[in-house]
Amino acid sequence: MSATVTARDVLQVENLEVVYNDVVLVLKGLSLAVREGEITALLGANGAGKSTTLKAISGLLLSEDGEVTAGSVVYDGQPIHGIVPEQIVRRGIFQVMEGRRIFVDITVEENLRCGAHTRPRSEFAESIEKVYTYFPRLAERKKQLAGYMSGGEQQMLAIGRAVMARPRLLLLDEPSLGLAPLLVEEIFEIVTRINKNEGVTVLLVEQNARAALSVSGRGYIMENGRIVMEGEAKSLLDNPDVQEFYLGMGHAGNKKSYRDVKHYRRRKRWLG
């Protein structure tokens, strides 16, 4: 499946293949496009290849013995596959890793400053104040060791640290993981504000399909290293297959039990 490229697409991933340890093929000809200034959702179950896709874009595959063996990643008209991560960050791409990867033994403010290591020091104060505007809890705890914060606060810190880099494209990997529904709603609302106020393009990887599609303009669904469905977010939310297998709803609008949903691999109509 080939992604449709328009003049507004700032990121194009075309026919991408990724192999780990020279033997394990994880991405199998994946293609997608991200429109500038929008939030795009990338959905799928565990093991579908979502995180690998983000790492292929951000250049972090090499640290895990991964390699792009075919296809291309083009950002703002320039190929970036094969470029080292620091150069990719300098081009305006920043990834927030799954699992709240923060420095637990230093303070909140010191964590934030680490996010701005590619920026001029003259920007630090202004950038930190901007982060505190979006995340007031971080301002309240700026002198606290990050390891003593709650899971939701640590996720806010991870996103805030990314904002310190002044990204043009923000890659978010499972920001809702392990968080209570109210915190998920709060964090997604803040991400939406950052997108609108700062003009930051967002590629959002999630298993929480409803939350992700509710803030996105477009979405892609992955299975087994391939894109199996794509479209505008609203059309995906209204799609019976997506409702049944990713939102837990039956065709009559009834909640599906896990026992029903777990059979979806044998029944996915979009794979034929």
Where is each model-derived feature located?
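Conserved catalytic motifs of ABC-family nucleotide-binding domains
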Residues: 166
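Helical segment within the ABC ATPase nucleotide-binding domain
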Residues: 185-199
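ABC ATPase C-loop
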Residues: 162-163
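The feature captures the beta-strand-to-loop junction immediately N-terminal to the Walker
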Residues: 43-45
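ABC ATPase nucleotide-binding domains
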Residues: 249-272
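Helix-to-loop junction immediately C-terminal to a conserved catalytic motif
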Residues: 58
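Conserved ABC transporter NBD signature motif
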Residues: 68-78, 124-126
